[in-house]
Amino acid sequence: MKFYSVKMRASLNDRHVSGGERITTEESIQKVVSELLTRPKEFDFVNIKIEKINNIKFIEKSLDIKTINVKNHKEGNEIALKLLEEVGIDREIAKAYIDLLHTGANPDRENMRGAMIITRSGKRVEKDRYRGVRTTNVDFLHREEVKKILLEKKYTERTLDALALSTKNLNHLDIIAEYCISDQPDYTTGYVAVNNTYYRINPLKEYSNPKGGRIYFVKDDTDIEELYKYLQEESFLIKEVGSLE
């Protein structure tokens, strides 16, 4: 079976406003393109890129999902720090970079386009502090079935996409954990991915805060060139969804 990567990027007044990507079969390309084009509410430029995938790899099962509801974002981040501490991430190191993410992680104190990469010892090692690194080329093999399962459990398509990304991330042996908050001011749910589990924490950031992004915590001896290649170039389909709580 042939698989294709379909990527959409939309902008308004030269500012990125929406994006999405899927891996699909040749027969479903037109349907997927139509679905992606419904994502941006307003735009003056949209780019669709369709590319054949020559080497597709498979992950048997996604991370499990656990939802944690808390009173406020401070309590949510306390839980996040404890989860990170459990896998050997120093609390003060984690807190410093999480605080930075909540206030703007690029040199201009705005949002980065991709993720920060932080080693266990606290070094910040992504190649570009404006661009960061983006995880791409991952989807569910039976996306519509998994989407239906998640929606029945009151999750969203946003969760579906984030679960796919975090599953690919933690599939890499050098990625210890991931921390993520949205850059949308009215979306306060975030997650920590660690120990084969996607901990969905609500809320993880303060309402009306426009800052957001991702942090990938990695081992000290991580080969950064290889990691970039894995995250940005290697293509994966996830066969099944993990357990849901």
Curated annotation (Swiss-Prot):
Cofactor(s) for this UniProt protein: Mg(2+)
EC class name: ligase
Reaction(s) the record says it catalyses: heptanedioate + ATP + CoA = 6-carboxyhexanoyl-CoA + AMP + diphosphate
InterPro entries given in the database record: BioW
Molecular function in Gene Ontology: 6-carboxyhexanoate-CoA ligase activity; ATP binding; magnesium ion binding
Record key words, sorted: ATP-binding, Biotin biosynthesis, Ligase, Magnesium, Nucleotide-binding
EC id: 6.2.1.14
NCBIfam families, per the entry: bioW, PRK01322.1
Subunit structure, interactors included: Homodimer.
Similarity-based family: Belongs to the BioW family.
HAMAP family, per database record: BioW
Name of protein: 6-carboxyhexanoate--CoA ligase
